[in-house]
Amino acid sequence: MAPVKKLVVKGGKKKKQVLKFTLDCTHPVEDGIMDAANFEQFLQERIKVNGKAGNLGGGVVTIERSKSKITVTSEVPFSKRYLKYLTKKYLKKNNLRDWLRVVANSKESYELRYFQINQDEEEEEDED
């Protein structure tokens, strides 16, 4: 058998990639139908790092709340889609899924918006 060569990467250490995602809950929090602190607690309990929920990888993932915006910062690969999944799960648990939806308003942020119900269509049906 031929000896196995080890690949040596020149250039030293890899640059740490810090991922930062924000969840804007301004509208539902102002209207009083949702509690941002409760949502932050839900994320801390549910986010999985290395297959384990609740510990946030010993500081690898951090969750910060400022008024009605929640910021999730991660030093390990973390999916924005996973954050959307957890947000939808929270909305379903609190029976808010029928009124709120999760919309991406930029590359690294989500916003909770109300469903737009067309008032014109309802008025036309009432007239008939």
UniProtKB/Swiss-Prot annotation:
**Any GO BP annotation:** alpha-beta T cell differentiation
List residues, modification Phosphoserine.
Answer: S66
Listed disulfide bonds for this chain? none
Mark the transmembrane ranges. Answer: none
As stated in the Swiss-Prot or TrEMBL entry, residues carrying the post-translational modification N6-succinyllysine are K69
Entries under Gene3D superfamilies matching the protein:
3.30.1360.210
An annotated Gene Ontology molecular function = structural constituent of ribosome
Q: Which UniProt keywords apply?
A: Cytoplasm, Heparin-binding, Phosphoprotein, Ribonucleoprotein, Ribosomal protein, RNA-binding
Task: Give its localization.
Answer: Cytoplasm
Under the heading Pfam families, the entry gives: Ribosomal_L22e
User: Where on the chain is Phosphothreonine found, per UniProt?
Assistant: T62
What InterPro entries does this protein map onto? Ribosomal_eL22, Ribosomal_eL22_sf
Give a GO cellular-component term: presynapse
Mainly resides where? cytoplasm
The UniProt family comment states: Belongs to the eukaryotic ribosomal protein eL22 family.
Q: What else is known?
A: Binds to Epstein-Barr virus small RNAs and to heparin.
Q: What does this protein do?
A: Component of the large ribosomal subunit. The ribosome is a large ribonucleoprotein complex responsible for the synthesis of proteins in the cell.
Subunit annotation: Component of the large ribosomal subunit.
Listed name of the protein: Large ribosomal subunit protein eL22
What gene name is listed for this protein? RPL22
